[in-house]
Amino acid sequence: MGNHQVIFLVLCTSLLFQNTIQQNVSFQLIREIDRYTPENFVLSVLNIEMILFEIHAAKAVESNNDLERSLIINFGYSEARQEVLDWGLRYKKASSAKFQMANKVAVSQKLPLSQKLRLVNEVLMTSAKKYDVTKDVRPSKLMDEWLSSHLDGVLANFVQEKKLNAGENIVAISGMTVTPLWASHFQSEINRYFVNNPGTGYASKDPTCVPMMHSLSSFETMSTDEAKGIYIPFSSANLGMLILLPRKGVTCKDILDNLNNQINVEYNDHKDVHLLLPIFKEKFDYNIAKFFNGINIEDTFKDSAFKSKAKIKINNFRVNHGIRFQPILRLEVVDDIDTGKTETFEVNRPFVFVIKDKINVYAVGRIENLDGLTDKVNCSKKYADL
């Protein structure tokens, strides 16, 4: 098959440029997916932004020989090179948090863009390794196996030579799986009910008895008119997960339509909270190319040091993004928890999660229904009796 396939791990951008991406593309994309996808979804904002940046930068290099030479010899165009270094810093942070991420971009090998994509990818990977003092950027057998099992089969289904040779068609595929390394210690496991959203088309519209992990720890919480939230830090990289529970009369869609305001709310001071999180895993396998139709991708890069007015159209954009909510260690199963007078935050209904740090969003998900996503367990009481 005549094409150029680039495998890369997601990297970083500077504060100003990142905020532009987050607002102009990522949040618009999330709203579009939320609008047309009633089921659960998991979206690696990090991977998608990196794919768009690589294509944009490659198009800029294609039209500027001096910029291309600068990237090759590492001299001149300091702002562009610094932008690449900033992507590397963000990748290092995600890598430290043990994100499993991989992307591929494919265009016809006959096109000049193929060589430019390869160059941009090589510079990005070199920049990532400059920040990688622990050497965990280097390819590993585990990552190769993960790429093979999760991405190559999907790519083969829709990347065909006849398509790639038909003009400048671009195909992208993005894979991500994250199992959060919670900083908080979970003490026990208990079976509780999760109230599914009846409008999502899943088989079960009744509450599902699911295993939940329980932690009594000190957390930061937040509150808006639409949601109440709790921030659960990860054990590395200064990342964490913000869980947003919609208030009565508010939906997850309402939260996602106003996500920028939700995630920028100041947190309350730390306090002891009984946290109950469902134990489950979810995968979002979808072609998201159509969701970019109403988004001006080029406007996103107006502040980039890589200058290009070329249109970006990705003909196929397949994502395979997943999340696993699970304890780090095996927990003792208990029948009940004495919460006393301490505040309880129980994630027992549809919710939104955001993996983030103080500046950047790394992943966003909406969980409407847990039917079939957890181990089958029995609750001690019928839901109607509670």
Swiss-Prot record:
One of its GO terms (biological process) is sexual reproduction. The record marks 339-340 as: Reactive bond. The keyword Cell division does not apply. Glycans are attached at residues 24, 378. Residues 1-22 form the signal peptide. It is found in: Secreted. SMART domains: SERPIN. The keyword Ion transport does not apply. GO terms for cellular component: extracellular space. It comes from the Eukaryota. Keywords: Behavior, Glycoprotein, Protease inhibitor, Secreted, Serine protease inhibitor, Signal. Its main location: secreted. Main cells of accessory gland and seminal fluid. PROSITE patterns: SERPIN (PS00284). Belongs to the serpin family. Responsible for physiological and behavioral changes in mated female flies. May play a role in accessory protein regulation and/or in the coagulation of seminal fluid to form a mating plug. This is Accessory gland protein Acp76A. The gene is Acp76A.
